[in-house]
UniProtKB/Swiss-Prot annotation:
GO molecular function terms noted in the UniProt entry: tryptophan synthase activity
Recorded family membership: Belongs to the TrpB family.
This protein's record includes keyword Nucleotide-binding: no
Biological role stated in the UniProt entry: The beta subunit is responsible for the synthesis of L-tryptophan from indole and L-serine.
Pathway in which the depicted protein is active: Amino-acid biosynthesis; L-tryptophan biosynthesis; L-tryptophan from chorismate: step 5/5
Lineage of the species this protein comes from: Bacteria, Bacillati, Bacillota, Bacilli, Lactobacillales
GO cellular component assignments: cytoplasm
Annotated organism of origin: Lacticaseibacillus paracasei (strain ATCC 334 / BCRC 17002 / CCUG 31169 / CIP 107868 / KCTC 3260 / NRRL B-441) (Lactobacillus paracasei)
UniProt protein name: Tryptophan synthase beta chain
EC number: 4.2.1.20
CDD domains documented for this protein: Trp-synth_B (cd06446)
Self-association and partners: Tetramer of two alpha and two beta chains.
Name of encoding gene: trpB
Keyword field contains Amino-acid biosynthesis: yes
Amino acid sequence: MKTLNETTQQSTRAGRYGKDFGGQYIPETLMTELEKVTKAFNDLKDNPEFKAELNDLLVNYANRPSLLYYAKNMTEDLGGAKIYLKREDLNHTGAHKINNVIGQALLAKHLGKKRLIAETGAGQHGVATATIAALMGMDCEIFMGKEDTDRQKLNVYRMELLGAKVHPVTSGSMVLKDAVNATLQEWASRSDDTFYVLGSAVGPAPFPEMVKHFQSVISTESKQQLQAKEARLPDMVVACVGGGSNAIGSFAAYIDDPSVQLVGVEAAGKGVDTDRTAATIERGSVGIFHGMKSLFMQNEDGQIDPVYSISAGLDYPGVGPEHAALAQEGRAQYVGITDDEAVEAFTYIAKQEGIVAAIESCHAIAYVEKIAPQMAKDQIIICTLSGRGDKDVASIAKYKGVDVDE
């Protein structure tokens, strides 16, 4: 049997980014299903009825539009650029993940699927998928690396509470990449009634495009909101990057505005120059994994290296193909933030703004802390808070040596 990482079929230019990123590198057993998903997405994405159904759920269920919040205390404390926070943490389920899940679940419904499966790292995508499955009366199974089930026990219980079955994945490094492998294997073995709700802007086409499409609501809103508040574009948009869904959603509406600097913040872990990092764009090389050509952390033989971050949502050994292309073309800049810097930012934003933000988002906040003082007071940064930090409080306390009862 062919493995899921074996190149059995390539796409044409469809699903390609930059010179050669993206594509479809998957076993033929999944090609027919991918073609169905691609057709459904292309047929429905601009369909007025589908758009109305999607918008109704985003507004009346997910609590959109999310706030664009002026972080006055941070702005004054850092003494430079004006800082606005795009509050995806205020969405139903507490993160940006629900934007994409609603869209994909509606596609699944139109395709007649009865069962949703998904991978999850920090658990937020799993929670969002379980939530929408409950709403739509669909079965749901979530695959999560055992390392992540151990450090995100609250989200595991939350998924089970919502009616999902959670599978701890014990193969490989037992983290997000292994959860993706397990979910792909499950989809290949049972695609007749099952839809794979991929949570990040990764995987074979059309998933990166589809995830970007459903997450672009973040930047579509922020552009309109800043126009209403300041009557101008931001100078910089900052978002954390694992696989890259919240970042591509945060960048989407600005990619064609060259005056707007786009900054993706990766997890440097213990340091970009150590072997305990997940800074894929800075450290990775071109390869093929999880059905796409992109940048990956890999050895000379093309075997995927283990990656590390304090953040379960950022320790993916690759990055979405559009991010790889944006980096290659110089349209976006990607920087690394260490565990220590992210933990400091977790405390900083809590004390400055009264917001407990996800440790993933705090990587972006840590970069804002560095860059804002170097910018003029009439410049504007939009930083996306991809999620809330309730899930991280116990692990951050432990990291700091504080004993708390989870």
